[in-house]
Amino acid sequence: MTNIRKTHPLMKIINHSFIDLPTPSNISSWWNFGSLLGLCLMIQIVTGLFLAMHYTSDTTTAFSSVAHICRDVNYGWLIRYMHANGASMFFICLFLHVGRGVYYGSYTFMETWNIGVILLFAMMATAFMGYVLPWGQMSFWGATVITNLLSAIPYIGTSLVEWIWGGFXVDKATLTRFFAFHFILPFIITALVIIHLLFLHETGSNNPTGLNSDADKIPFHPYYTVKDLLGALVLILFLMTLVLFFPDLLGDPDNYTPANPLNTPPHIKPEWYFLFAYAILRSIPNKLGGVLALILSILVLAFLPLLHTSKQRSLMFRPITQTLYWMLVANLLILTWVGGQPVEHPFTTIGQLASISYFSIILILMPISGMIEDKLLKWSL
């Protein structure tokens, strides 16, 4: 009798995706982050669902309902902090996953990569709206500042902002719709993830060498299921350490003060995972220019396949571009640090220099170094 997993219509899909999937034999731990992102998404949906059962999306009771979850609901504090810190773990895995894709040239899988960029935007939107829900000071002012950026759009800007707000200020209507969107987006993300995997399985996985691995494939199960399980255990260890010992490490103390439209916090800043983009936004003195730079800082990923000049796919054997890549990583860390600093000298200058070098490395230096390496290997035509 044939195994049910190979005949049953539903089991067959699962079998071809997670069990009998032919996988390159040499993929390293950098390939673990896809499954870890899936785990993060599941944790976020489950904890978010339980939080939604007790949360009220009304300006008068939102802050109190979060306090109620932490104080009165059974293990509410655990669910709340798992959700808040789970978002941080999600973005850590996300940045490492994207970084791996850039390093090993995975962006040459155009469809998979573009869905990935859309996923990144969807996750950033979800995280931003989730940050508004506790209705603390930073929630309110973060929502005000970021939504206000849309007013930079010529002609329709002001109307667009008021339409998103549902009034003339961030108020009850804004909070209610943000809660609705924050609830629905993770399910849209889940659908996009399935499409992401569908496109990936059309081509098969990339590997560290960037070479064709058809000659050396192994089944996904048990080799990579066990490897992913180890990664999952490490992720849960990190997450629970954060939740149980340092729950407020990555949060903002201002968010423990209820939202007050009459009192602006001295330093408005987003969550740590948006600081690099926030620094790029702030480094341009023009409002519209800043907004465009902010969008482009993420959208630039979509242009990577067009900027690939080398005849080699991966950076494994390309020392010049490798150096530029790690300069880019250092640059992003500097931008993250600057984004959390006040708008004053020398931080503004550092932010501007880091923003210029960020775009220069990606758009100019990396394509040039790819051509130089081809020339050095006498590979150029």
UniProtKB/Swiss-Prot annotation:
GO terms, molecular function: metal ion binding; ubiquinol-cytochrome-c reductase activity
Annotated transmembrane regions: 33-53, 77-98, 113-133, 178-198, 226-246, 288-308, 320-340, 347-367
UniProt cross-references to PROSITE patterns, sorted A to Z: CYTB_CTER, CYTB_NTER
Localization, UniProt: Mitochondrion inner membrane
Any one of the GO CC terms: respiratory chain complex III
Record-listed heme b b562 binding positions: H83, H182
Binding of heme b b566, residues: H97, H196
Gene Ontology BP, a term: mitochondrial electron transport, ubiquinol to cytochrome c
Leader sequence residues: none
Membrane topology, as annotated: Multi-pass membrane protein
Cofactor notes: Binds 2 heme b groups non-covalently.
Keywords: Electron transport, Heme, Iron, Membrane, Metal-binding, Mitochondrion, Mitochondrion inner membrane, Respiratory chain, Transmembrane, Transmembrane helix, Transport, Ubiquinone
Role played: Component of the ubiquinol-cytochrome c reductase complex (complex III or cytochrome b-c1 complex) that is part of the mitochondrial respiratory chain. The b-c1 complex mediates electron transfer from ubiquinol to cytochrome c. Contributes to the generation of a proton gradient across the mitochondrial membrane that is then used for ATP synthesis.
Family as reported in the entry's similarity comment: Belongs to the cytochrome b family.
Note: Heme 1 (or BL or b562) is low-potential and absorbs at about 562 nm, and heme 2 (or BH or b566) is high-potential and absorbs at about 566 nm.
Name of the protein in question: Cytochrome b
Organism: Apomys gracilirostris
